[in-house]
Design a protein with these regions (language model features):
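Active-site mouth loops of central-metabolism enzymes
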Residues: 43-57, 114-124, 160, 209-222, ...
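An alpha-helical appendage that flanks or caps ligand/catalytic pockets
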Residues: 2-40, 68, 165-208, 239-354, ...
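Glycine-rich, proline-tolerant flexible connector loops at the mouths of alpha/beta enzymes
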Residues: 73-95, 239-250, 362-375
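Conserved, mostly hydrophobic/aromatic
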Residues: 34, 66, 70, 101, ...
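Hydrophobic faces of well-ordered beta-strands that scaffold small-molecule active sites
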Residues: 32-38, 74-76, 110-113, 141-145, ...
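Alpha-helix-loop-beta-strand connector modules within alpha/beta enzyme cores
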Residues: 85-111, 170-172, 256-264, 374-389
């Protein structure tokens, strides 16, 4: 493991879990937290018509509607791809876009994704940006920690992809330093051991509202799990069994327990989130027909489409896809697929919760229309089932 800026003196460095009134602590009071997995890229998983748009205005409208419905979290990915990497070559930066939503929302946690090693990003920059966004959002902003898994992305920044486990060691050093910068009451100096940066008399204000911003990690590897256990508050998990809900429910309990037990070793707690796409209509037959229509429009391999491109990745989290030991899903867009009537959707959400999942970051094929349907038909049943209070 990395040699990092472990705290030996000075103030008690706290995080959002240490404050009952923090937005994170309040969100976690829900038996199953609800989040949106926004699409800020012009990516299409099917040619079936949809209202979706990568634009800021569209995504703001969706987030505001989700907030009205009581959703706790908004999140988006970010990627660095060459021309042709996206279906329409248009994308917004998650760090900026989610931060900007602080001014037009009131209660949702806003989680920006940023590749912390590209550049590499200096901790003083990130600490100041984070403290500023935390101030604007009144403690509702957080960061999804990404180290980068695609070779093409590292190459875009001028070097070869860094070894998988070393990336997490480098990120661990960065976030130990960030925590110090956010929490220290005096100037802080540090010489990077794994990263090519140093700090001399670093000082960051304003201090974050609840110790530091909410930290999120999406991972599935042993190195990533250890990093998340040490640093993160929320962990995006993926199904070791692939996208089919049956396989997910078989494999998730052990996987989730491993992550939570690892956090306990460090005297910490984490909550787990997973990313389902929810495809629902009034009857099972209608929901399957909707899923069939989406699947029929999927791009074929070799076409100029994000969903058909096979970028070189060393990520561990999606290895369940294509594993012949497990039932396979339809590859409709989420990490797992929940397809059925509203009643069946809720049954599957209950099963995920029993498997140790604390929240869902939902994809919808049509974010505007399917979110409205979710609010009208599924959310009331979730309340009846005890998933929402």
């Amino acid at each position: 493991m990395a040699l990092t800026a472990e705290k030996t003196s000075g103030p008690d460095l706290r995080g959002p879990w240490d404050f009952e009134e923090s937005p994170l602590s309040q969100a976690a009071k829900q038996p199953l937290m609800l989040g949106l997995f926004l699409n800020l890229q012009d990516i299409h998983f099917s040619s079936l018509p949809t209202s979706n748009s990568w634009t800021f205005d569209y995504n703001v409208d969706v987030v505001k509607r989700a907030e009205e419905l009581g959703f706790e979290i908004a999140f988006s990915r970010t990627q660095w791809l060459p021309k042709g990497g996206y279906d329409g070559d248009s994308s917004l930066d998650s760090f900026i876009a989610l931060g900007a939503m602080a001014a037009v929302t009131n209660s949702m946690l806003l989680i920006s994704t940023i590749h912390v090693l590209y550049g590499p990003l200096h901790p003083l920059h990130l600490a100041k940006y984070g403290a500023t966004l935390d101030h604007i959002a009144k403690g509702r902003w957080g960061i999804n920690i990404v180290t980068g898994h695609r070779a093409v992305e590292h190459e875009m920044f001028g070097w070869q992809r860094i070894d998988h486990d070393k990336r997490y060691d480098m990120a661990g050093e960065l976030f130990d330093v960030l925590h110090r910068l956010w929490g220290e009451t005096e100037n802080f100096s540090y010489e990077g051991k794994l990263n090519p940066w140093a700090i001399s008399n670093g000082w960051i204000t304003p201090k974050p509202s609840f110790g530091r911003p909410t930290l999120v990690t999406a991972t599935g590897s042993p190195a990533g799990i250890d990093f998340a256990a040490r640093h993160s508050d929320l962990v995006f998990v993926t199904s070791p069994g692939g996208a089919h809900i049956d396989s997910a429910l078989e494999t998730l309990p052990e996987h989730v327990a491993t992550i939570k037990n690892r956090a306990k070793i460090y005297g910490r707690q984490v909550k787990t989130l997973i990313n389902p796409i929810i495809v629902s209509r009034d009857t099972e037959k209608e929901a399957i027909a909707y899923a069939d229509a989406i699947e029929a429009g999927k791009p074929q391999a070799g076409t100029r489409a994000f969903a058909a491109n096979n970028y070189d990745s060393d990520a561990h989290a999606w290895k369940g896809r294509g594993d012949p030991r497990h039932k396979q899903g339809r590859n409709l867009g989420g990490n797992i697929e929940i397809i059925g009537s509203p009643e069946q959707v809720v049954e599957q959400l209950v099963a995920l919760n029993k498997a140790g999942i604390d929240g869902v970051q939902i994809n919808f094929y049509d974010f505007r229309d399917d979110l409205d349907y979710f609010g009208k038909r599924i959310l009331p049943l979730m309340k009846e089932a005890g998933l929402r209070v």
